[in-house]
Each structure stands twice: as structure tokens, then as C-alpha cells.
């Protein structure tokens, strides 16, 4: 990050291929494109770049969750460039919503998924647990189920992991983790992930020896404060599977929740277990060439019913964060077809939302400020309008808002009024 310059999320493409792109030949893979949108604009990842002073990166939480600022972007229903920006405090959120509206939270819990250790050769390693899996779910042809010295391997405790090391560990190699309190063997690879077989149940050992995987831009190790503040106040302890927090929810405390309830604003929950891919940069020049990471998600029927009833009553559904957005819009594509009502759904989602996407469920989005060139910045640009997001980010920088996971929040209106409707498959 460099010293502040005017935010411009609409920079000219510098890549020759992008400049000369024949847009008539581009295949749009998004299943939900707004027929009124210029769907082939803003395809260059450089369109989502901006400059941010390092001093505005929030590396520690405020003393009180709801003490953060809230930028309300009241988007015009006609042009996304005619938007009103209102500075509020997060504790005033209820004032911006109406009785009968529905807020949807993500109830996942963050694992202490970061571990440190060494290979049996002595080389240091850092392990980040991405997902716990059953060995039966893996491709057996890529697995080596014995150590380099021919010993059998415990196949009950398997995880997909990121491993940092000066030299990548080999198949069958033993890893000593947490000063020897945890042992694992490399039994395979799945794309950029290592498949590790642990000697003992993984989750209890993570709680004892693991470190909370706070974002890399914090530039520090997790401390005792993070163990509380990098979790939401309403997480489900049984849903311990994320490697990053649903950060928009970190602002909520009892004060805010009580105000929402007192006003008659309803709440519901979905689950999305956040993977490390949420921090992964987009490495392609053209966003249509980006491969989106996949995460497990679940929309329960009780929440689907509340959403359907809320819309039937003419009220709004407010997604708390991009993770909730991805769950609800995926479930809409999967279940709300041919005029059917939204219904329960569970599975992996790799939905990629960028300008031109036609939202089927959410009416407002509460979110934090996102990293340059990130898929999350593309998502909010799709929702509120790219020009409006550009204005809001410049306003936030000029007024010293705090950015990223421990930063301030923004409440976004949808760019156009689109009611939940039948999926039009491309």
C-alpha cells in the first residue's frame, strides 16, 4: 500500500490483450446477468485497484465491537453515480432498517488453524489447515498410504493443508508439529494443497496448539485478544471449520443486537466455512479467466422460509457480509428456478460475483472495506454499482475510515430494485 491517491476503480487497461479484447467473443459464464447491465465492462482486474495509506489498515480491533464507523451508501435507483453517502456509527445500524426486515448472519467459527513445526529432516514449516476431510472423499490414485520407511498410516484424521517450507515436503514424509505434540504424514497433493494424515483427532489439538489464522496483512502473530475478537458473538461452537472470520459480523455486540430486536428487525443464520482462498489475489489480467475458490455452505430451510416471508411482506433481506451473500445467491440459483420459492441447500459453492450479476435474494449488504483487486471488491461493485463504490472508497479514505478485517463497515443499497425472480440460465 502506498500514500493516498484518488481512488480510481476504472483505470485504463495497461495490458495489450485487454485493450484489444473483442468483447463480442467473450463467453459470460455467470448464470445471473442483469439484462440492463453493461455486462462486458470492467473485465480487467486493474479496474479494481486503488491506493490506500498504510495507516488506514486496521491491524487491531477497537476496544468495543460496535464503536466502529458505518458508511451508508444510499444508492440511486437510476444511476449508480448519483449515490448519497451518509456517515454514521455502527451502533446506529437499526436506524437505517425497518421493522420486519430480515438480517442474515453466518454462524461459522474460526479454527486455530495455523501450526508451526518441522520436517523430519529438520527444515521449518508452517501449516494452515484448510479443511478436514474423510479419506473416502479423496482420489485414491494420488494417495501414498505409507511413510517413506514403509510404515502404515493412520487414515482417520485427514486434512487439506497449505504448507510453507523452504523445500516442499515429499510424499510419505513425517512432520513434527507444535514441538512434537502433533505428528502428521504427507500422503498426497490436491492442486496447491497438501493432504496430511494426523496421528490423533485434529480439532482438539488445534485448540491446544494452534494459532488463530489472522490475515497476513496484520503483519503479526495472533494474540489473546484475537482469540475473542476474531470470532463473532453468535458463532455456533459446533461449526468450527473456518480459517477466516466473516468479518462484517465482527461489529455486532449485545448493544446492537438488542436495538435491532427492539425495532422488530428479524435475524436468521446460514453457514459458510471461510477458506484461505478469501485472501487469494486474482492473478489473471481478465477476471473472466479467474478460477474462484470453493467453500462449503448451507442454507437451512428455516432461514429460506423467513426470507420468502420477508419478501412476501414487502420487506428487505440484509446480508451481513459477502459470505452470506455467496450462500444466498448460490442457493437461489440452485433452488429458486421455474418460479419456485427459495429452499434449503447445502454443498460447495464457487460462485463468482462481478458487475453484471443479477441478485435474486439480498436487498442490502453490510460489509467491510475490501482489498484492491479482490473478488470481494468485485462483488460489492456488482451490488452497489462500480462508480458508487469508487466514490464511497474515496470518501472513506478522505475521512480516515479503517480498512479490512478489523476495520469499519459500510451498508450498501442495491443499485437497482430487482425483486427475487426466476433464474434465467445462459
Regions found by a protein language model. Name each.
Residues 2-10, 34-426:
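Surface-exposed, charge/polar-rich loops and edge strands
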Residues 18-19, 23-27, 31-35:
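Asparagine/serine/threonine-enriched low-complexity, disordered tracts
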Residues 16-18, 29, 421, 425-426:
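N-terminal targeting/docking segments
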